[in-house]
């Protein structure tokens, strides 16, 4: 019988509608059945250097980093019986194998930032474990890390723990393919309107309000008993603003299944230039939903065939099928740029995040500064905004400058078929 460590997620509802997810590291057998729960989760601290954390903090990816390290030292390369037996060589070997993508049964390519996140998580985890088991551990804290003083993103001098040994990474980074010409965007969104209107608002929320795909899955209908997820501001009979509620991750399904994480809890608005396009999409979608069921007691905006709120995983799989349908459409086009993009899609994978990238490129070309991009994208860090602004010159060469007149892509066929957009 072989075993491995895995992450188990338990979800419950508190305060009547808010979702609370807790992760545990469990031991599973070769059939995937849980044999035992461990207490390793108690050594996994929040990524924020704070004495307290939000009750909704689920640990993000930290549990997965730790589970991978535990499998490495208990089963894959070394065969220790207790974590007290871990040595600094084992830790160093794991982090370097992880950084160079040569772990057993794991050849994933990783970015430098992902490797850094893993290193920090493992150091914090072992630091906490050693502190509580110092009389039993073979490894000492001074062997594990040293404390240095660095300047953070805001220019403030802070202390940070870094490994006391060298960690390398391969640098063989696979570039993420996210570019999408406006012509292709028009074709794609019209294809969604005609063939897949069930995910139209997920596309619109990312393209016109900058929401992350998983965040878009959290948006509720205007009549949701949990509170309106969308509010339309109307002045003199005209919609002048659309406000989106992302303040809390709520339970939107009768089976308690989370639909996706909200990375930054906030109130978000549709970008003004895209207001008309967003409203057109909304009208088309709501006309479509008149003939489809949904769980009214939760009021999720986007639902699956069973009427339950769509999850990010379900959205991702559906999007991949749409891309497969899109490729022959692009290849049959008479425009050389569109045909070329079709060939690129045959060689590169894209995900629903491409709509948020399209949104970010448009805002950069519209002249938004760092603060503006951070606000409209819902970012905590300025790094992404700075990257877009640093590449603005190249973006201006690559894309034509577009104004609000771009958004006449709502074809009359779609308006007739679904009764929206007028």
Each model region followed by its residue ranges:
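Basic, Lys/Arg- and aromatic-enriched nucleic-acid-binding interface segment
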Residues: 182-213
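Major-groove DNA-contacting interfaces characterized by cationic-aromatic clusters
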Residues: 263-318
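C-terminal secondary-structure termini that scaffold catalytic or DNA-interacting sites
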Residues: 404-422
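Conserved tyrosine-mediated DNA breakage-rejoining catalytic core shared by Y-recombinases
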Residues: 219-281
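Short, basic (Lys/Arg/His-rich) helix/loop patches that form interaction surfaces
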Residues: 317-375
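Charge-rich, intrinsically disordered N-terminal extensions
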Residues: 1-131, 422
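Flexible interdomain linker/hinge and immediately adjacent N-terminus
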Residues: 135-184
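Catalytic-site neighborhood detector that most strongly recognizes the C-terminal catalytic loop/helix
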Residues: 377-403
